[in-house]
Amino acid sequence: MSAIENFDAHTPMMQQYLKLKAQHPEILLFYRMGDFYELFYDDAKRASQLLDISLTKRGASAGEPIPMAGIPYHAVENYLAKLVNQGESVAICEQIGDPATSKGPVERKVVRIVTPGTISDEALLQERQDNLLAAIWQDSKGFGYATLDISSGRFRLSEPADRETMAAELQRTNPAELLYAEDFAEMSLIEGRRGLRRRPLWEFEIDTARQQLNLQFGTRDLVGFGVENAPRGLCAAGCLLQYAKDTQRTTLPHIRSITMEREQDSIIMDAATRRNLEITQNLAGGAENTLASVLDCTVTPMGSRMLKRWLHMPVRDTRVLLERQQTIGALQDFTAELQPVLRQVGDLERILARLALRTARPRDLARMRHAFQQLPELRALLENVDSAPVQALREKMGEFAELRDLLERAIIDTPPVLVRDGGVIAPGYNEELDEWRALADGATDYLERLEVRERERTGLDTLKVGFNAVHGYYIQISRGQSHLAPINYMRRQTLKNAERYIIPELKEYEDKVLTSKGKALALEKQLYEELFDLLLPHLEALQQSASALAELDVLVNLAERAYTLNYTCPTFIDKPGIRITEGRHPVVEQVLNEPFIANPLNLSPQRRMLIITGPNMGGKSTYMRQTALIALMAYIGSYVPAQKVEIGPIDRIFTRVGAADDLASGRSTFMVEMTETANILHNATEYSLVLMDEIGRGTSTYDGLSLAWACAENLANKIKALTLFATHYFELTQLPEKMEGVANVHLDALEHGDTIAFMHSVQDGAASKSYGLAVAALAGVPKEVIKRARQKLRELESISPNAAATQVDGTQMSLLSVPEETSPAVEALENLDPDSLTPRQALEWIYRLKSLV
């Protein structure tokens, strides 16, 4: 900033601003001046564009006019929300000195830094979504990744081994802000993400990280958290914790532990799979018609966030899953009674985070009190549920009768938004406060009595007593009667139609009232802070209670969904395989106006791969996706949309379904498809569920069929993964004859003239034809084009009548058996008669043949 070059030439106020700005050069500085936050120089220009506010000039400093933009302090939350949504960070600078006693500029300092990943204010957060701060670190052995939800205290770390796993983690967690080292090598992995923050290398040092974490948790080492042997994850976690402390400018008592997330604990889904299955976000980027939109009827925001975490991290521990299933079954008869009470609990988790940060507002404490008031009724309802896990949750949620009583005594029923204006602490809570308030409130009675007395004494019927913030208390007389004002009335203000006066008695009372109001407000703020001190020792138990209430909300919700949507409880088996009777797609069945056609599925070690054929729009993709979604739902402990389900162990779910050009990375549709396919072939195991849809369609017929055949062969024979393989290459329907564990199924359709009816029913065996022209006609392709296509199809079929049945083992000509090209050297030798050559000609031929090789 050019302003700093001639620092001494600036006014004292601008010098103070420039010093503070130098400490926060890369973020906007909101500089408090009276009732406004001002921004200057480049900050003002940026803010005017980002917030669409006026850019003006403020006088001159160092001989130059100062670009300036300002926002009213009482509307700051709205502007902060806009900036945070655009990925910006803001340093809030407040006046901390007293203007009355300050010589020169009032003392100011930055009291907090608002960044997209460290916000806890209710107005700035998405209610039903986690808001994560993350840090990423990389060395020669892999990645370290840490996430922190400052609005709940949830702190996690992991060590993704490779780029694909790291990309999947970024997709799953979707951080609002991402910290990375200044020498981070894989920039293409994070480019284009919101809230990127470059940090110095020293912030990622392992020794500093261990020290920071031990200090935060009050421990000597990190062995108890199971993260001691995760150096890359710790490097990321250390940087992240330091950043959180720097921005909050306070202790973070609600962050009490850190958890290691291990690959073997959950079903792994890569970024493409999460996108294709539309778990919490559809392919267009919205939230409608997703799995979460069907399953999430939770009644608390914290329950909704927990359910989404479950959906993105299906659990592999069958003990946990069976416990959840049993709980859902036990709660089905109680959902109608429990949900209305749970709804009243609200977002206790985030209220507790604001309590820990000492930023909780009066209404937060009122909501906490309301949550506590629901606990006795909840505990009474749960007492009747015959389930050990439910009783464990009931114990964990506690009752907090003492804290409820404290808040009932301390906070009025409907407190104002902020404590700064007073009127928060309830009457009767503090004797001294009540006395000061009585003095201040007595003003109304006094003024009414004074007005009546003075009116009678002077005989002036227009006389009235009032108050305003600038001039204090006054006696007002109309302009027509002002010449009759008594001699002891001192003029204070002249208005167009009236005169305002002061008398010694009124001035004396004004001083007394203002003093008592000031004393009452100061005491009220002190008592409010003391409430934090009384509540914070219970923080750990309160956080456990919030977690139990959120889990109860999720399980009650899943019980309600299971009953309402006619879901069934899946059975877990020991061997790999999935057997589904009458399976349905959980999302499609909700948006269809007609009944959903349920279909069976049978995958086992003896039937590992299904080759799925049938017309476009016939339901192949729906059938494949519903299988993956049923598996995912089973592995969060939920009931599933089917008549009966048996499911074996699954370690990963892969999808290669649909694709679009990745223009940002310069990759074509086919390149995207092949990258996803390579990932599957490298990482799938016999316990993986693999969905392959139309592999090889993005290139020539020969190349595409070759790739599809080889991929199917590899998955069935070598990897032995549970695979659904949809294709339009009818040659692939020969695979079951050539290898074990492969079977054909098809989706039925009926053709009548130029029309086609999709039956959406899965049958054994291969489809008889593709119905491509019928689908094209249905899509509105002009009739003359369809007619010409039928002619061309007949021509092609007459040229190659056996194309659909061609074999790939070489016994007859096929699409895959490309004739070998004859080399020029061989052709020349075939035309050569060695008996007719002279020695010289023979030598020339040797050189000529050499040149042809």
From Swiss-Prot:
This protein is involved in the repair of mismatches in DNA. It is possible that it carries out the mismatch recognition step. This protein has a weak ATPase activity. SMART domains: MUTSac (SM00534), MUTSd (SM00533). This is DNA mismatch repair protein MutS. CDD domains: ABC_MutS1. GO terms for molecular function: ATP binding; ATP-dependent DNA damage sensor activity; damaged DNA binding; mismatched DNA binding. InterPro entries: DNA_mismatch_repair_MutS (IPR005748), DNA_mismatch_repair_MutS-lik_N (IPR007695), DNA_mismatch_repair_MutS/MSH (IPR017261), DNA_mismatch_repair_MutS_C (IPR000432), DNA_mismatch_repair_MutS_clamp (IPR007861), DNA_mismatch_repair_MutS_core (IPR007696), DNA_mismatch_repair_MutS_N (IPR016151), DNA_mismatch_repair_MutS_sf (IPR036187). GO terms for cellular component: cytosol. It comes from Escherichia coli (strain SMS-3-5 / SECEC). PROSITE patterns: DNA_MISMATCH_REPAIR_2. GO terms for biological process: mismatch repair. Belongs to the DNA mismatch repair MutS family. ATP binds at residues 614-621. Keywords: ATP-binding, DNA damage, DNA repair, DNA-binding, Nucleotide-binding. It comes from the Bacteria.
